[in-house]
Amino acid sequence: MGGDIQQKVADISDVIFKMDTDRLTERICGELKYAANRLEAVRLPDAPPASRRAAALDEIERAGRETEQMISLLSSELTEIYKADAAYSCLRGVLEDCSKRLSYLSAQLGSGEDKSSVTLRHISDLRMSVTVAHRYITMADGRREYLRFLVSGINSVLVNTVPLWRGALISASENPGRENMSRLGTLKEAMTTAVRDILLEASK
């Protein structure tokens, strides 16, 4: 009675345990760090003289390429995070259902007249499976919370910083004067700082 549900709890708990969220986040952080370093390495002059205009435009173009690679990377990582979050959500739902059914079976057995050692042991096993289910539900929730933090940080960069950066990039490409170059440099720093903030929080 309830053996198939208990087995499902064991199987799903094992799947959750083996889902390597750490490896996923380590890969994401490694790629973001590399992208941030490349963007940071771009040297944007404040106001290039006419003789340096072509070189400045080359640097602006390079900054644009590095940023687009970073944006593509951020978007790609979001997709991977959403997949992991959906998997945890699905597994958590199954565990929650199993927990309710096992609790119901345990209560049924406990209210019966049969108080033999076999029945009592069975009740104990059912309750243990409920405990295991709740433990892994908590684990799944914790990992989902961490993934949501990454999503929030990445979305903030994509939604708040990237549009400003692209606008500044166009302005600087059309007119690499002091004001436009200064704004571009400020936004480049804001972009790399935002990504490094994500990395810093992710490492805690």
Residue ranges and their predicted role:
Residues 103-204:
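Long amphipathic all-alpha helical oligomerization modules
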Residues 1-92, 99:
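Leu/Val/Ala/Ile-rich N-terminal alpha-helices, chiefly Sec-type signal peptides and the beginnings
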